[in-house]
């Protein structure tokens, strides 16, 4: 596996790729969820490029940019074990200039839920991914369903900008107890890890209600809210795959999402119905 630390090194590597190229963009602190994305890419492409870049434009003032977990040696090891061809560590000064053109995410979907709590976040996501897609020129790019709102926004960007790549959604990876894997889980102490399970358990309750033919969104959200106590809940939402709110769950076309604070750490989770 090659370690690439500049745009010129990346472009040279990419020019020598003869077949399909899979791309896994990350912010590092890689875990088994990322490993699944990388393995999926390795199995479906001739070469796989992973990027690690803690993108400053998607963090708001006061968010955890400086505290965001970083583990370069661990990231390298995971990428090697998963069979990645190259690992790209961009430099922010190369990625961004002082006179940066703006890319604005679609207003409706980028200003609700995650976008309401983190205004401008998805603009930063679109900005960096547009640059990385142009640099890597991947055949396919891999994204986890855990960040489902981001996934839908990226799919929209690829379509609207006529980018020649396939976005491959990958299922959420969970611990054996149901906790969705997240780099931010490293912030949690043992007691908080127990409370964090309330997110996945609230979604399991929603799933069980749906299996019992309860499809009313308000009833499902109310039951989830009870399950989440005493956490500080940011939102509970039932939407279709275009992130339009729906009054009743539509089997095969719905996402149920939750965001809540466990201590000072904000966690998200969802299930696709």
From Swiss-Prot:
Gene3D superfamilies: HUPs (3.40.50.620), Pantoate-beta-alanine ligase, C-terminal domain (3.30.1300.10). GO terms for biological process: pantothenate biosynthetic process. InterPro entries: Cyt_trans-like, Pantoate_ligase, Pantoate_ligase_C, Rossmann-like_a/b/a_fold. Beta-alanine binds at residue 58. ATP binds at residues 27-34, 144-147, 173, 181-184. It catalyses: (R)-pantoate + beta-alanine + ATP = (R)-pantothenate + AMP + diphosphate + H(+). The keyword Membrane does not apply. Transmembrane segments: none annotated. Keywords: ATP-binding, Cytoplasm, Ligase, Nucleotide-binding, Pantothenate biosynthesis. (R)-pantoate binds at residues 58, 150. GO terms for cellular component: cytosol. It holds the Pfam family Pantoate_ligase. Pathway: Cofactor biosynthesis; (R)-pantothenate biosynthesis; (R)-pantothenate from (R)-pantoate and beta-alanine: step 1/1. It is found in: Cytoplasm. One of its GO terms (molecular function) is pantoate-beta-alanine ligase activity. It is an enzyme of class 6 (ligase). The reaction proceeds by a bi uni uni bi ping pong mechanism. NCBIfam families: cyt_tran_rel, panC. Catalyzes the condensation of pantoate with beta-alanine in an ATP-dependent reaction via a pantoyl-adenylate intermediate. Homodimer. This is Pantothenate synthetase.
């Amino acid at each position: 596996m090659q370690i690439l630390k500049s745009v010129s090194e990346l472009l040279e590597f990419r020019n020598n790729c003869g077949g399909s190229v899979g791309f896994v963009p990350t912010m590092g602190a890689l875990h088994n969820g990322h490993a699944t994305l990388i393995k999926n890419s390795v199995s479906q492409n001739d070469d796989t490029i992973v990027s690690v870049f803690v993108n400053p434009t998607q963090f708001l003032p006061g968010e955890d940019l400086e505290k965001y977990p970083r583990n370069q040696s661990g990231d390298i090891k995971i990428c090697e074990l998963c069979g990645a061809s190259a690992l790209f560590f961009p430099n922010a000064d190369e990625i961004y200039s002082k006179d940066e053109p703006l890319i604005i995410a679609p207003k409706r979907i980028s200003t609700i839920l995650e976008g309401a709590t983190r205004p401008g976040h998805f603009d930063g996501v679109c900005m960096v991914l547009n640059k990385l897609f142009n640099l890597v020129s991947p055949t396919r790019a891999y994204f986890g369903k855990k960040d489902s709102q981001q996934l839908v926004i990226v799919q929209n960007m690829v379509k609207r900008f006529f980018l020649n790549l396939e976005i491959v959604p990958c299922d959420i990876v969970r611990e054996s107890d149901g906790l969705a894997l997240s780099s931010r889980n490293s912030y949690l102490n043992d007691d908080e890890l127990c409370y964090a399970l309330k997110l996945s358990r609230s979604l399991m309750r929603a799933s069980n209600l749906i299996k019992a033919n309860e499809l009313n969104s308000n009833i499902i959200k109310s039951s989830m809210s009870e399950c989440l106590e005493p956490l500080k809940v940011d939102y509970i939402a039932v939407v279709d795959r275009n992130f339009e709110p729906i009054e009743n769950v539509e089997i095969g076309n719905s996402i149920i999402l939750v965001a809540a604070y466990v201590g000072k750490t904000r966690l998200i989770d969802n299930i696709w119905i």
